[in-house]
Amino acid sequence: MGVAAVGAVAVAPSNSQIVWVGGGDQANARSSMSGDGVFKSTDAGKTWQPMGLPDSHHIARIVIHPKNPDIVYVAAMGHLFSRNEERGVFRTMDGGKTWKKVLYVNDGVGAIDLVINLKTPTQVFAALYDKERLPWQIVESGPESGVYRTDDGGEKWTRLTSGLPGGKIGRIGIDLFQKNPLILYALLENQNPKGASTGPVNSTSPLAQGIVGNELYRTDDGGKTWRKVSGDVNVAGGKAPDSFNQIKINPFNDQQVVVNSDSMFQTRDGGKTWTMDFM
């Protein structure tokens, strides 16, 4: 693989010899390196073959069907410094020989996260990210960032909006509680202004004084309705959007959620309180 950065790695649940890698930094920060598509190994990483999507540049997530390793979904952010059409969610049904773009909004919106329902693998959730880095400005949020769901393997997608904020939304991380797949968490970087404050500056969260910050939302009905569960806590300490990488639910306890950032943040009470463990 001739890439300087890797944004996603996935192992097929039904065959551990099959490994997929997506090139490019998924964080899209100041010094992000681009990649040249997705690569596949069928011998547990000994050898690799390029499998397409070279113009996607930044692959953020790869998910594989739990029983059929030929069905793969890829979340592509696209070019960092310019608009392009090879972004969104792509699907292959033949192990990477051919690809179909199944979720696409426009040439400035990429896909940043994916999660598949292991019990009903035709159901997939995706998070789209409205972002573009210009030479003179970083556009790191917008109205097209959102959470989507498909129930038919990617042919038709529905944007999930009830209870979720709109407007200037940045990066979104999602995870599904596989024991009860009606439960889904979404961590949203809410860049909408929160209004003027007369209180003291929070030295541990200097970037979040003028915006709402990172919020955790939960759905118990598969995304039909959402509620904020993080209260007034700025989850992940108000870090920049390129600082939190992934959100994960304890597979045995839906009250424990972990956010992977430059530190590890976790809640054991469904988002009410958080602890931070430096790494």
Describe each region flagged by the PLM.
Residues 1-279:
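Beta-propeller blade termini and top-face loops
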